[in-house]
Amino acid sequence: MGETATDSEHRMMIGLSDPMKIDPKRDRFPCCIVWTPLPFISWLVPFIGHVGICREDGVILDFAGPNFVCVDNFAFGAVSRYIQINKEMESSRSSSSGMFNGERRYEQEEDSHEKEPTWDDALRKSTQEYQHHSYNILTCNCHSFVANNLNRLSIKSGGWNVVNLATLVLFKGRWVNKTAIVKSLLPPLIVYTIGILLGGWTFIASCSILVVLLTGWFIIGTYCFKKLIQL
């Protein structure tokens, strides 16, 4: 079967010439960032969702509650969108000139004589760290966990946070299938249709305020008060 234009564009975006096998039926997404909508919250703010990161064998890891990282049991349902990462081409760990500030903190914790950690090694360290973190949707959430992993891996020279991670998934995430599109977009469409019919401009204004407040919180908490949003 020939490669579609979408397939080719996605490969170019992530730098893959031969992507690892993805199997949505078995929930296997090797070296991927994965996303699924959150009940109720995503119905009002569709670009907000739950994210996880996958091991090399495709098993999903996601920070789903206080001191709890799910393994191979993605919270809130099946994966709807994903981004596969070429770990060899995307990592800049070996480039000292491209080292991001956050990575220095992680490297100081490790023995300089140890061999360079693998993808799964980095995910294991982040998992162990977040098993001692309290969960808070506003300050320490699933996006914090995935950003922590990406920084350990020095993906795209690091500097990952909840804002640029959410932006990446929103604009670069690839839909798993048509069912995933319907599952993600139909509930917001229904809610907004009913809300506009019943509430009119009041409903639109309320949703707009909610979007501005949530977006503003994470942007200000990430870039103005850097200790507020944990990574």
Curated annotation (Swiss-Prot):
The chain crosses the membrane at residues 33-53, 180-200, 201-221. It is a multi-pass membrane protein. Keywords: Membrane, Transmembrane, Transmembrane helix. It is found in: Membrane. GO terms for biological process: positive regulation of signaling; response to ethylene. Residues 92-119 are annotated as: Disordered. This is Protein RTE1-HOMOLOG.
